[in-house]
Amino acid sequence: MQNFTVSNAAKVLDVSEAQVGRLLSRGEILGSKWGRSWVIDAASVHRYASTRPERGRPYLPERAWAELLDSNVRTMDDAKKLAVLCRRRAVRHGVRVIPGFLDALRKDSRVVLSGVDAGRKFKAMVTLGPPVDLYVHVDDVEKVFKRYVSEDHVTDPNVIIRVVESDVLQQFEHHVPLIVALVDLVAEGDYRSAKEVLNAMK
């Protein structure tokens, strides 16, 4: 697995090293601390690069959710643009959960499932597989992490936890709508599953 230094990541993304530090702290790129230096997962840098805006800023969380839930996506290009604009609707954590706990995590009433789990719920022709993608409200995140998460900010997560501060999750019954699952799959680079979710939306 290829790794970057902070300097490498800054050059790839054409940002300052301080901005790389902020991306690490928000979980938008992944890395591990070795002494006083960071070892950054190159795949997460490239994933971030593929979904960041070329100009302007992504929407703030409240507007991001409003735009996302009111959107009318017809193509994968539309989905990619929406994923860019709405990327800050939640704080992303790539974590490791012991495989034997995954079923319990999926059934936990404090989580709202996204990705392929939501796709399957709404009849998209997707295959269940890692990573599990889900949302958790900020008020519940500490308890969810304590119960299930063995390691946070890992380079090979089997669960993506997206932490939300607003009350938007209250309107969903344990699974996000297909449009949210779609942009999450696009953001993770799972274009094959994303295309199946898009087909199910038509």
Per-region residue spans from a language model:
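Residues that form generic nucleotide/phosphate-binding pockets
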Residues: 48, 67-70, 85, 89, ...
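Long, leucine/valine-rich, helix-dominated scaffolding and oligomerization segments
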Residues: 71-93
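Phosphate-handling catalytic interfaces
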Residues: 95-202
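Short helix-start
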Residues: 3-4, 26, 30-52
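A short, Lys/Arg-enriched interface patch at domain edges and termini
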Residues: 45-78
